[in-house]
């Protein structure tokens, strides 16, 4: 038996398969993969809208120039560390980036971006996401072998689409899959 070939999925999108992941946080989830190495993987769910928050209050922005609340949608990125907030955003904003991708996306997690968004000087597109998803070494590969996830290239239109409820269905359509015809029986040929 030979060694398995590692396929790096950083910058890709995971699409939860229908009828396999049937409940919980991963049901019909789309996950943007921040990092995927042989040591594990980290991603952000980007279609779990949970509420709207005031950036000024959340980040405790002390700036007298911001007089009204700056309400933004808040997404649940995964079950780990909900006290951590991230901005998944377009790469037109490049101050103090946490991660910079070559597919026109970046991730920031600092006070400066929240202030810039509040002043209208932030990125053209952004999602505020709390928490993240992580896999131990080999765990994601095992889930992929069990067909729990489909993999698609990053598509900014899906990530920043206005209607989070339709993102998953639109991703399936993009992959040429009709949920109705997706088998609840899984396996590899």
UniProtKB/Swiss-Prot annotation:
| Coiled-coil zones | none
Q: Name one Pfam family in it.
A: DUF179
One GO cellular component from the entry?
cytosol
Matching InterPro entries, A to Z? AlgH-like
Q: Which PANTHER family match?
A: UNCHARACTERIZED PROTEIN YQGE, UPF0301 PROTEIN YQGE
Give the similarity note: Belongs to the UPF0301 (AlgH) family.
Q: What is this protein called?
A: UPF0301 protein RMA_0049
